[in-house]
């Protein structure tokens, strides 16, 4: 039986400060929730081994700062990502409105080979709170308008839909990683012009 090489999937979590990016990551990886998280400075990551369709993969989940002054740190962190998770707070409409700019910024900084089909997943977090402002319908409509991005409503505090969301994230990231590997292994062939190939060698003679 041939041993398959280990797969490392790089996942980036983006969204405004305070939407729960760190809480979601810690709930998924460590099954813990805390109200005491400080704002992330720069970026931090956690890893978790998961089974995706009978394949063991290591997810490297990057939690980036949501403050605007840290957005310029993006390039190094975004490059090589296999999936991007966009998070907003369902009780804070402004965090939903900025999803467009987070998505655009990621595509500019990460420069994926196929931006149209790059896998995103959107999480509407804090559904355990009562003062909801962004409806499910509104969030789903936005996701559909962006090439049908998968959408999950989550609560990092109550561990609602966190596991399911990250299963989809892992599956989509693995698909992206596999496609990139195939592309690198079999790049597009260089097409020679028919006339170029048919040129007689006599043409190069200077006599």
Curated annotation (Swiss-Prot):
Tissue: Ubiquitously expressed. Expressed in liver, spleen, kidney, brain, intestine, heart, skin, muscle, gill and stomach.
Chief place of localization: membrane
Single GO MF annotation: GTP binding
GO term, biological process aspect, one: positive regulation of protein catabolic process
The keyword Ribonucleoprotein belongs to this UniProt entry's keyword annotation: no
Lipidation (S-geranylgeranyl cysteine): 205, 207
Ranges in coiled-coil conformation: none
Function of the protein: Key regulator in endo-lysosomal trafficking. Governs early-to-late endosomal maturation, microtubule minus-end as well as plus-end directed endosomal migration and positioning, and endosome-lysosome transport through different protein-protein interaction cascades. Plays important roles in microbial pathogen infection and survival, as well as in participating in the life cycle of viruses.
Protein name as catalogued: Ras-related protein rab7
Higher taxonomy: Eukaryota, Metazoa, Chordata, Craniata, Vertebrata
